[in-house]
UniProtKB/Swiss-Prot annotation:
CC annotations in GO: cytosolic large ribosomal subunit
Cysteine pairs bridged by disulfides in the record: none
PROSITE patterns (alphabetical): RIBOSOMAL_L3
Keyword list, A-Z: Ribonucleoprotein, Ribosomal protein, RNA-binding, rRNA-binding
Protein known as: Large ribosomal subunit protein uL3
Matching InterPro entries: Ribosomal_uL3 (IPR000597), Ribosomal_uL3_bac/org-type (IPR019927), Ribosomal_uL3_CS (IPR019926), Transl_B-barrel_sf (IPR009000)
Assigned protein family: Belongs to the universal ribosomal protein uL3 family.
A GO molecular-function descriptor: rRNA binding
UniProt xrefs under Gene3D superfamilies: 3.30.160.810, Translation factors
Alphabetical list of PANTHER family matching this protein: 50S RIBOSOMAL PROTEIN L3, LARGE RIBOSOMAL SUBUNIT PROTEIN UL3C
Amino acid sequence: MKGILGKKVGMTQIFTDKGVVIPVTAVEAGPMVVTQIKTVDKDGYNAIQIGFEDAKEKALNKPKKGHLAAANVLKKHLKEFRVDSVEGYTVGQEIKADVFEAGAKIDVTGISKGKGFQGPIKRHGQSRGPETHGSRYHRRPGSMGACSYPGRVFKNKKLAGHMGSVKVTVQNLEVVKVDADKNLILVKGAIPGAKGSVVTIKEAIKVSK
């Protein structure tokens, strides 16, 4: 499976030859470096580990420095991707955005924007109560359940709580354009996370027919 790490730059729009507007998200994908290779004989499966975004030496602990010494790099983020074969990969090899091409279908994983503590209307899309005519029910969560039996609040009751800042995957997005020289990938539509957040881009596992 092909996969890379990238940093969300932001959203913009491009125009097709027919003048159709396409909203796209720009992702700075690379350059990355192969930091480790795993094989069936040694590890039980084939995989490559890649490092993304340069780090200062003082920001890394000794175990991580020792791990990255073979590739002779200092990287903040490490990610492992399983592959069918490790042929063609070497430790220290540079990987750029051109592993994907325009028209490819991808899955993008990132950490969603944190919204803090939110009520059931914003967090779950619950309907609100009337504003006027003597109503005292506006933005409250509603019934907690029966009184004497079962005498408790059921699990998964939609209540207020922490919203966002969770791992989210958006599937079957389309790569609109790849600029290998600038290490940019333009993805159709929105992807999870805030500007500057790190995202994982993989081949789509459920390709639309």
